[in-house]
């Protein structure tokens, strides 16, 4: 999910280590390379998906019957705490507003209508302020967090919500963009984007995947790669990701704010 071009080599190193761990545990066949030719949704729907990462909200809404959650990575990017992350609410650096409340009747841009970080968490932050009424002058969809930030920086939108791991990567990789932006507030927290596999993956392969993941996250030779990706550790305990995602949606409905507008 954070596979920026500059980070693909790092992701490939992690996958190579994970693939070796699976082969050592007699899992076959194991792809030699990561698949980058499919969209996120095509990947999540693929019956042969062995290992991937997913946004929690679309999993909860559309893909729960197709995917098994393997584990939750923990990140050390600003805005992350243990298994949880937040979205940064971002505006232009020269925007005079000091609080989210002051963005009322402004132009909002969201990456995707079913994004947890871009919509669901943002809606949770807005719901008590909106209290059932329209909050923004307009809401448009950009297709990606990166595109949303471009629109805000260019003055074509006033505010967006971007997950904190994406923002941390862009602050490293594209300071010429992020220097034109600032964080005005943070959303409520949600579990980090989980690692997933197809529901068709066997129990023995699930066990092997979790064991191989534990090895990848404890391998000292991979420490620089994990650091580059802000990966701190991995939580292999029973998952509560989708429950929290649904709680935030229910809370927004309680505030009579079911749709971000």
Ranges and model annotations:
Residues 71-73, 79, 83-86, 175-211, ...:
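Periplasmic-binding protein-like
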Residues 1-66, 71-75, 82-84, 221-261:
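N-terminal hydrophobic or amphipathic helices and topogenic motifs
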Residues 54-57, 94, 113, 165, ...:
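Solvent-exposed coil/turn segments that connect beta secondary-structure elements
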Residues 50, 54-64, 128, 153, ...:
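A ligand-binding cleft/hinge motif common to bilobed small-molecule-binding domains
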Residues 1-21, 82-148, 223-233, 239-242:
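Bilobed "Venus flytrap"/periplasmic-binding protein-like clamshell domains
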Residues 120-133, 137, 141-153, 178-180, ...:
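Hydrophobic, well-ordered secondary-structure segments
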Residues 210-226:
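Short glycine/proline-rich, acidic loop/turn segments that cap or connect secondary-structure elements
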Residues 44, 103, 152-153:
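Hydrophobic residues within well-ordered alpha-helices
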């Amino acid at each position: 999910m954070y596979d920026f071009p500059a980070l693909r080599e790092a992701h490939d190193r992690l996958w190579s280590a994970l693939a070796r761990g699976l082969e050592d545990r007699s899992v076959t066949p194991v792809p030699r390379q990561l698949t980058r030719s499919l969209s996120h949704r095509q990947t999540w729907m693929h019956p042969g998906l062995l290992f991937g990462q997913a946004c929690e909200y679309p999993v909860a809404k559309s893909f729960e019957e197709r995917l098994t959650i393997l584990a939750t990575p923990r990140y050390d990017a600003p805005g992350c705490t243990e298994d949880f992350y937040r979205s940064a609410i971002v505006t232009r650096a020269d925007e005079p507003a000091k609080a989210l409340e002051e963005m009322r009747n402004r132009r909002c841009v969201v990456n995707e209508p079913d994004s947890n970080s871009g919509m669901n968490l943002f809606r949770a932050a807005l719901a008590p302020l909106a209290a059932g009424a329209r909050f923004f002058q307009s809401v448009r969809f950009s297709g990606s967090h990166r595109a949303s930030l471009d629109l805000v920086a260019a003055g074509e939108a006033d505010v967006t919500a971007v997950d904190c791991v994406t923002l941390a990567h862009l602050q490293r990789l594209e300071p010429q963009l992020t220097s034109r932006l600032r964080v005005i507030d943070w959303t409520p927290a949600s579990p980090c984007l989980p690692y997933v596999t197809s529901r068709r993956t066997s129990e023995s392969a699930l066990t092997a995947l979790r064991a191989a993941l534990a090895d990848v996250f404890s391998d000292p030779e991979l420490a620089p790669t994990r650091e580059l990706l802000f990966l701190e550790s991995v939580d292999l305990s029973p998952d509560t990701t989708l429950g929290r995602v649904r709680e935030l949606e229910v809370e927004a409905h309680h505030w009579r704010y079911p749709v971000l507008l």
